[in-house]
A protein has these predicted regions:
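Catalytic cores of nucleotide-sugar-dependent glycosyltransferases that transfer UDP/GDP/TDP-activated
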Residues: 1-436
Length: 436
């Protein structure tokens, strides 16, 4: 089976979150199972781009509204990732250093989707599946069905749409509908949701199959989906919750070259002690105290706003018998709070504002506990990384966290779970961790 994954991220090419991890791993394992898996993504100015060799495989031109753009498709030559990787280069739109956060992101990802459809439409054969990931590629199921230029040749190609996070839907005002390729006008309702063009809603309507990244998240979307609750309920017949996995070759404490000492389950105690000592030394913490870490975006979705008070209370309540370490970036005000806490709780708390892939590996290997108090967690990969490295996950009982972590109080439990995204629930769980 030939499967074409279309996404905005793919690790290690360009990654902003869990989407990149999944798109970087899933095609590799599909290929190992005998399928032909490919990834198509935008060409950003990243280290991976400059460090590898590429060949030009296609050039073309298209329009978004009245604006013509030229695009080219380049392919990584050596199959370095274990699957065919293609980058779409659109000069002035996609070739930027960051993935997201530009004022013209609508035009950027719209042009990317149009270019992908235009390219695949010119293939001498049809792929077996187009697998679209999140709202950045969510208009493709509509385009292949109803865009006048594509539908005759592409409408019968099966499409799968995976919801990695329904909070971000890619809304486009109807005042910009002219940017879209010409389509059957009587199908405008397949784009619309609450009087706006909603790419995610369109994909849920138009894709042959819809998947979410955990079983529990699919159920939760019928109750809380940022306005799409009724749609997910209506389309439940073609929707499936499939739990994400992790790349066990990248995340392997026995071979990981980003940690201080490698180990397996027989040497886990010795290995973690060495990594904890290394980590504590970097951040001025005590390697003999329990280390509770948080790795993630500093946003409300992750309950990061609760961290300063929960950590402060826990340090006072337990007389400094635990250390805390935070890795992440996001809300500037929250970043400032955490920075101030480093001085207030010197020797008990520290943080690294930003993202560091090497540091995240060392934190999984050197921490005793990983805290994930998320308000929303479609799947969550961090708790799986933690378990892989022998670190106990402390998670809210929601989404993929519910599907992957059982509480120590249950039979065969191996984590700490709590029900509420609240300071009280977090501090109580921290107390349970310290008492172990």
């Amino acid at each position: 089976m030939e499967i074409v994954h279309i996404a905005a991220e793919c690790y290690p090419v360009a990654k902003a979150g869990g989407l990149g991890d999944v798109v970087g791993a899933l095609p590799k394992y599909q290929t190992e199972l005998g399928h032909v898996a490919k990834v198509v993504m935008p060409m950003y100015r990243t280290k991976f781009l400059y460090d590898n060799e590429w060949e030009l495989v296609h050039e073309g031109g298209q329009h978004i509204g009245p604006q013509f753009f030229h695009y080219s498709i380049i392919k990584e030559k050596t199959n370095k990732l274990g699957f065919d990787l293609y980058l779409v280069d659109i000069n002035g739109l996609l070739d930027r250093e960051k993935i997201y956060g530009y004022d013209d992101d609508t035009e950027r990802f719209l042009s990317f989707q149009v270019a992908v459809c235009d390219w695949i439409n010119k293939w001498s054969h049809k792929p077996d599946v187009l697998h679209c990931h999140d709202h950045h590629t969510a208009l493709i199921p509509f385009f292949v069905k109803y865009a006048l230029e594509f539908k005759d040749n592409m409408a019968d190609i099966p499409t799968v749409f995976t919801v990695h996070n329904a909070q971000y839907q890619g809304w486009i005002g109807w005042d910009k509908y002219y940017l879209l390729p010409s389509f059957d006008s009587w199908k405008w309702g397949m784009l619309d949701w609450e009087k706006t063009i909603n790419p995610m809603a369109s994909a849920v309507k138009c894709a042959w199959k819809v998947t979410t990244v955990s079983h529990s998240y699919l159920d939760e979307l019928k109750e809380a989906a940022n306005g799409l609750e009724h749609l997910f309920g209506y389309e439940q017949g073609k929707s499936h919750g499939i739990l994400n996995g992790i790349d066990t070759q990248v995340w392997d404490p026995l071979t990981d070259n980003l940690i201080a000492k490698n180990y397996d389950k027989e040497l886990v105690e010795k290995g973690k002690r060495k990594n904890k000592k290394e980590l504590a030394g970097k951040f001025g913490l005590d390697p003999d105290k329990p280390l509770i870490s948080f790795i993630g975006r500093l946003v409300g979705e992750k309950s990061a706003d609760l961290l300063p008070e929960a950590i402060s209370q826990s340090i006072y309540q337990h007389n400094g018998h635990a250390n805390f370490l935070v890795l992440g970036s996001g809300d500037p005000q929250l970043e400032d709070q955490l920075d101030q806490m480093k001085h207030k709780f010197n020797g008990y708390f520290n943080s690294y504002i930003g993202y560091s892939e090497p540091l995240s590996h060392l934190m999984y290997a050197g921490s005793d506990f990983l805290l994930m108090p998320s308000r929303v967690e479609p799947c969550g990969l961090n708790q799986m990384y933690a378990l892989r490295y022998g670190t106990v996950p402390m998670v809210r009982n929601i989404g993929g966290l519910r599907d992957t972590v059982t509480d120590m109080g249950d039979t065969d439990g191996f984590g700490i779970r709590f029900d509420q995204a609240s300071i009280g629930a977090i501090t109580y769980s921290i107390g349970r961790a310290i008492d172990l």
